[in-house]
Curated annotation (Swiss-Prot):
Keywords: Ribonucleoprotein, Ribosomal protein. One of its GO terms (biological process) is translation. NCBIfam families: L12. Belongs to the bacterial ribosomal protein bL12 family. The lineage of its organism: Bacteria, Bacillati, Cyanobacteriota, Cyanophyceae, Synechococcales. Transmembrane segments: none annotated. Forms part of the ribosomal stalk which helps the ribosome interact with GTP-bound translation factors. Is thus essential for accurate translation. This is Large ribosomal subunit protein bL12. Homodimer. Part of the ribosomal stalk of the 50S ribosomal subunit. Forms a multimeric L10(L12)X complex, where L10 forms an elongated spine to which 2 to 4 L12 dimers bind in a sequential fashion. Binds GTP-bound translation factors. GO terms for cellular component: cytosolic large ribosomal subunit. It comes from the Bacteria. The keyword Glycosyltransferase does not apply. InterPro entries: Ribosomal_bL12, Ribosomal_bL12_C, Ribosomal_bL12_C/ClpS-like, Ribosomal_bL12_oligo, Ribosomal_bL12_oligo_N_sf. Pfam families: Ribosomal_L12, Ribosomal_L12_N.
């Protein structure tokens, strides 16, 4: 590898999950590509087959985004702990995410997992929506 590519790789290794996610979105926009294009084709095929057999199944959403809308100031630490556990973010990144609400906590997760996370955040004092 060249020194330039090694430097880029080292920079990428130091990114948090939130920063890496934002980087992927920026790359997708800048180059007009999708990082999940091949996985989307694999995922779409079973869904399309199920949709042909049952029209209702095609309309049911299977992946959800968990969005922290707001939180009680007194419960900030509790919400922060739940967000850290769910995302694997470091303290600083999780704090930044919580303080910048409304903000997406997790994207594209299963309905059951999304509902569980929503319940945990709400019990800690946050207000959450699923999209």
């Amino acid at each position: 590898m060249t020194a330039k590519t090694e430097e880029i790789l080292d920079s990428l290794k130091s990114l948090s999950l939130l920063e890496a996610s934002e980087l992927v979105k920026q790359i997708e926009e800048a180059f007009g590509v999708s990082a999940a294009a091949s996985a989307g084709v694999v995922m779409a095929a079973p869904g399309a087959g199920g949709g042909d057999g049952d029209g209702g199944a095609a309309e049911e959403k299977t992946e959800f985004d968990v969005i922290l809308e707001s939180f009680d100031a007194a419960a900030k630490i509790k919400v922060l702990k739940v967000v850290r556990n769910a995302t694997g973010l470091g303290l600083g990144d999780a704090k930044a995410l919580v303080e910048s609400a409304p903000k997406t906590v997790k994207e594209g997760i299963a309905k059951a997992d999304a509902e569980t996370l929503k319940k945990e955040i709400e019990e800690a004092g946050g207000k959450v929506t699923l999209k």
